[in-house]
């Protein structure tokens, strides 16, 4: 008999139903469950797949550069970044005739094009790229890296080049190399690029390979470095009248601590950014030499963990046993990595708008909105994944004997307290926030807006004041004009910071009021509830009150009837599934808040947000309905415009989202009946019955149908909001 899919599971390959296909796809990447898997092959497969992942990333970024160089308007945009719309790529086949061709021919293009809202133009411009040739060079280099990565992946699957398990479990060496190599050396290299290429480009000097060795990045060269006069590198920075990309008003400094923003580009000073990366490089180069390897110096991570005894013995045996537990569990390591990456991605969303690093990106409002939303959603998915793998760790890798009375075991021992406290926090936040919103709604409805309950966020305002915001009149720390910190800050460190924080033209420490207080607590509700579901899913993964024997049922067991008290919605997978809905809702509120607050800021009518955000009808009417009006006006006498594609995507997103419910709110019996009926009709229809199948069609399992439903819900949700966000922002600001 010919080998059937899936080859990695003989049991599944012999399944006579369509379950073989779906279960095969579902477990294709669960290497641990494959036939004949060994620990060594598991590590080697994952290692090789990392090279493939890198190849895809390099190919994708290469494609971005290539298409902009080929079909974009980068060189025109560079001449006038504020008024030329950056083109992402051409549209090959604009349907709907001449009106569509005209609507989408913009940005100085000859034919229909897509506008770029990703910020790549601003990024490439800031780091010193100026011509299409530069972009093509970058694309070719990344294509080369992609090929190298593929070869690397193939090479490390060959017997001679396969690393052994001991190599994968050498935590100290890996940490040293990742800290000093990945973070340290790459940050140092980036500082080098900024100092040698980007900063000269911002001052009108074009440095490439042919003149790299002839152009001094600083008039005094390396002299100050070797003589210890490092402060010379900070002297004579660019002036406030500097025109970015020209020598007009430029200085000679390369490493500064100016603080605040370049007045023309509204982005951080490039010399500050270079200084930051140099500092990061030095920190990580030192950190990468801290752990003991072949040379017998430095720390052993195991010794560190074992030595860490909590004071007074109040936390049992502390970190004893953790080293082997973590080092032998890929899921634990992945959980930690995802948790870190999720937090970092959310911080990227926050900092890309509040402290924009790329020239002129702060004035490209649609790009700002798109980047914030994109990074917050990505962060949400990554963070839920962290808890999913945490749960799988408890099921597959956790050994109670190895972890007796250490912090992990104690988390499990008092999980009821953790879960109930989170539950209480969620209930408190939810009922109080909703109560305030609904009270305010009723007051507005009865025509007595003055009876709203409006709470000033005084603690948050105090924190903003401590950082130097003066408008609240708190007169504390950096906002106190006669304090020593204020006076020192004026001259010694970050002189531009206090100016920037009190200017109303940027997004640093936005002024907040009662509307912000309410939506902050709505978001806190979402965060706590999502966390509650995820934490409970992980801590109950091996056993809970209702079903103490989950270990052998695995991560994603389905509903199992009323036996053992019923197993509906109590597998770790069910918790993940439920948490993703809450995560999406929470990030919805986060992005609504960010977008509405910024739209009113950019339009100069902040009072609209301040007055309408204190009651639910305000959000529904003045944010959602008002801003989607361009997307829901249907066919109008003016025919097509450049927002039409977003109107279509808005509709299509709703369709995909609604399709999710077909899978979420129905049961297997219904589908099995439907499938049997369709199969019966097919077999009795002339011509159609010439097509046969070997696998008996069966309905999806409960878990699979939920996954398909969740996927449609998520994709539709994000599609819909993306169309709304881009259309409503670009419709207002071009």
Swiss-Prot record:
Location within or outside the cell: Plastid, Chloroplast thylakoid membrane
Record SUPFAM superfamilies: Photosystem I subunits PsaA/PsaB (SSF81558)
Binding sites annotated in the UniProt record for chlorophyll a B1: 654
MF annotations from Gene Ontology: 4 iron, 4 sulfur cluster binding; chlorophyll binding; electron transfer activity; magnesium ion binding; oxidoreductase activity
Superkingdom classification of source: Eukaryota
Residues that hold phylloquinone according to the record: 671
Enzyme class: oxidoreductase
Membrane topology: Multi-pass membrane protein
Keyword Metal-binding: yes
EC number: 1.97.1.12
GO CC annotations, alphabetized: chloroplast thylakoid membrane; photosystem I
Segments traversing the membrane: 46-69, 135-158, 175-199, 273-291, 330-353, 369-395, 417-439, 517-535, 575-596, 643-665, 707-727
Keywords assigned: 4Fe-4S, Chlorophyll, Chloroplast, Chromophore, Electron transport, Iron, Iron-sulfur, Magnesium, Membrane, Metal-binding, Oxidoreductase, Photosynthesis, Photosystem I, Plastid, Thylakoid, Transmembrane, Transmembrane helix, Transport
Pfam families: PsaA_PsaB (PF00223)
NCBIfam families the record matches: psaB
Similarity-based family: Belongs to the PsaA/PsaB family.
Role of this protein: PsaA and PsaB bind P700, the primary electron donor of photosystem I (PSI), as well as the electron acceptors A0, A1 and FX. PSI is a plastocyanin-ferredoxin oxidoreductase, converting photonic excitation into a charge separation, which transfers an electron from the donor P700 chlorophyll pair to the spectroscopically characterized acceptors A0, A1, FX, FA and FB in turn. Oxidized P700 is reduced on the lumenal side of the thylakoid membrane by plastocyanin.
Protein name: Photosystem I P700 chlorophyll a apoprotein A2
Organism name: Aethionema cordifolium
